[in-house]
Amino acid sequence: MAEKVLVTGGAGYIGSHTVLELLEAGYSPMVIDNFHNAIRGGGSMPESLRRVQDLTGRSVEFEEMDILDQAALQRLFKKHSFMAVIHFAGLKAVGESVQKPLDYYRVNLTGTIQLLEIMRAHGVKNLVFSSSATVYGNPQYLPLDEAHPTGGCTNPYGKSKFFIEEMIRDLCQADKAWNAVLLRYFNPIGAHASGCIGEDPQGIPNNLMPYVSQVAIGRREVLNVFGNDYDTEDGTGVRDYIHVVDLAKGHIAALRKLKEQCGCRIYNLGTGTGYSVLQMVQAMEKASGKKIPYKVVARREGDVAACYANPSLALKELGWSAALGLDRMCEDLWRWQKQNPSGFGTQA
């Protein structure tokens, strides 16, 4: 019998790619999502997961649910026996978090506390949590390793991830039956090689690469580059971009780690290489064969100049490392964008 894994927020960008990898690895994923960042496909299924089913030839169990809905979560845990939970659900826009801090704390913190309480009540004490490199705040040194101080976060989104990390650490400390792997993501981009699933931001993209690809396809006129006066090679912000498929595979490695009764473990998921905004624009121009017009505007509140990972601990302890390079990230992103000019709303 395939081990059942609950995936919260599993219809979103990273979630759907992880569900696909779970299926390929022989797990049985059960997905809950509230459609905050997903588009409905046929019936009650999110379009992203409908396509995952098509790609894998396997079925995905799905229930529409909000992690703030305690009664629904209780029913779910009564009905199913989960080996582990992969927790993606939450709000995730840095800029919006500065504007709406209470929303971020309510959904991310309260939602996670409720989930952990229900997991505990049902004896499900294995967790993979999607954290973020934003917990490091302004880097004191680069590359960032897991020992770098956390908590100096520059926005409520990052703070919410930091608080959740601390809660999970305390929980594992208090009850040795808990095992948790906290994955600090750097900047996931790209799409599945089929071009059938990818990142489909609702409204104006907050992240660089979906915006760049929408400019390339003609959905948007010009890219805004937030600041060119940073202390970096070309003055634009530097980030560690990682292929979403590599990132998704990191979650499979994390599930394996839980089997070792690992307690609380924390890993960076990044490539170890930083690229600037303008380097990413050039890489996307190369992949798409399109010119990408841009204009420089003011810096964005809460953005740091440069941020990239030291991913060596994940290699050592999880046997995981990023395999797909920048060209591949951009080619896969462009294939997704070209095949789906309107994202998941594109009619086949």
From Swiss-Prot:
GO terms for molecular function: UDP-glucose 4-epimerase activity; UDP-N-acetylglucosamine 4-epimerase activity. It catalyses: UDP-alpha-D-glucose = UDP-alpha-D-galactose; UDP-N-acetyl-alpha-D-glucosamine = UDP-N-acetyl-alpha-D-galactosamine. It comes from the Eukaryota. GO terms for biological process: galactose catabolic process via UDP-galactose, Leloir pathway. Pathway: Carbohydrate metabolism; galactose metabolism. It is an enzyme of class 5 (isomerase). SUPFAM superfamilies: NAD(P)-binding Rossmann-fold domains (SSF51735). Substrate binds at residues 132-134, 185-187, 206-208, 224-226, 239, 300-303. GO terms for cellular component: cytosol. Keywords: Carbohydrate metabolism, Galactose metabolism, Isomerase, NAD. Its EC number is 5.1.3.2, 5.1.3.7. Pfam families: GDP_Man_Dehyd (PF16363). Its cofactor is NAD(+). NAD(+) binds at residues 12-14, 33-37, 66-67, 88, 92, 161, 185. The active site is at 157 (proton acceptor). Catalyzes two distinct but analogous reactions: the reversible epimerization of UDP-glucose to UDP-galactose and the reversible epimerization of UDP-N-acetylglucosamine to UDP-N-acetylgalactosamine. The reaction with UDP-Gal plays a critical role in the Leloir pathway of galactose catabolism in which galactose is converted to the glycolytic intermediate glucose 6-phosphate. It contributes to the catabolism of dietary galactose and enables the endogenous biosynthesis of both UDP-Gal and UDP-GalNAc when exogenous sources are limited. PANTHER family: UDP-GLUCOSE 4-EPIMERASE. Belongs to the NAD(P)-dependent epimerase/dehydratase family. Homodimer. This is UDP-glucose 4-epimerase. It comes from Bos taurus (Bovine).
